């Protein structure tokens, strides 16, 4: 899963660097009460959260109520956490993401302004990823040369996979420039 892959890579890097850490697991059935985990991690400097923003918001609230001042660090899944928490703990949360809603890049500004006009809200990482996915697929579809609406779905899928993984195919979107490996794995710069 998304979270497990990030967790495994982070843990491997910590081991490689010789960084000491404490592991805590979260009950998949109980995603509302994180007091036991926060109590065990209270004296840590950083708590790594390879999760999505809903649970991260609950953990941030629990940290605030238990006097835990650790930096909560994660990836793009935390984009949106600000809407889940009180402003007093926002400075504790840090995450990396390929999308910056405040970017001055023309294509990003255009996307942000269009999104704001339509939804009366700022887009988050998930909206930007969806936008890029649609246009990457659209561009791959154009590259296939297939323009027959009645084309066989399997043939179309094969043609699109070939197009998107070709060495000359890339998509420069609002979250970065993307290329795809033969396996389908996406590389983003």
Residue ranges of predicted features:
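Extracytosolic ligand-binding ectodomains
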Residues: 1-189
